[in-house]
């Protein structure tokens, strides 16, 4: 309802919704056992693509949303608060199997053993807050300043799995009570300052240079727990300045190609990262990287938290300065509006983990995958309305 006579509260709205949604996977691959893109003597050929599961069902999502929107002083200040809870049942996941259970050879001659099944349940819940304000409000030609901010939290939990068992991958696991995309890795303990050997923590929390004794641990999720944005606009006599920022906190990112970026002397094939030059020597005992050893066998580059980084970031997505020519100058022309502008996109990003080299605002699975940041672009232009 809108309170036209109320000078303080101009808007008060309460909303709630609940539903049931079927969620098909992003493509039909989980539902197929053969593909027909193979070639045999220049003819179309079918080849195995998966293990049959006649009981595979759609995921079912039950979303609950409750919101409150408020406006004050004729909407000079607006506040929105919403709670969401989304429960997903019958999650579709590709689980590994032994080749004795269900192995098949794909078109590349690689033996695969996995099967898509409905493995369990997951919840996503959190709070979304939006605040908007017309901080300084004058006539269109006067000085005006407005700003908007939004903040969201996310609590993701896997609540039920097939037979209650962990599903462990090369770098991650699914476990009841943990978030999806949880990293499960040996914990890196740095470099032995006496010998330059790589170190990890064993199951008793002691330092070891034997990778086979290193204990895997839950080391965070690829999902951000806090994210949002901020935008603002200042204008005066046709001149406007617009800025937009975004941010994300609480997630981890894994560089699965770190073994090639930090070769530690293993081979000369790849140039690697520049920071690998900070390696152990008797004169540099507190180096970040182990002593270089050609054709090394100690698994210094094996999967571990050595290549796991914090994904926290703040990015200035857009900065735009514009000038709109006054209508009086456009009289007796066919032009209704002319705006001149200079604009920059993705011109600044602050990554809080100084050792991370790639774009922190990336795909949800949390793998760096040599991902380059969005290009910085600068443009000068004219918008014309007839």
Question: Which residues are covered by each model-predicted region?
Answer:
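Extracellular/periplasmic, surface-exposed regions of secreted and cell-surface proteins
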Residues: 1-176, 237, 303, 308-386
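Surface-exposed, extracytoplasmic segments of Gram-negative outer-membrane nutrient-acquisition systems
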Residues: 41-48, 84-119, 148, 155-223, ...
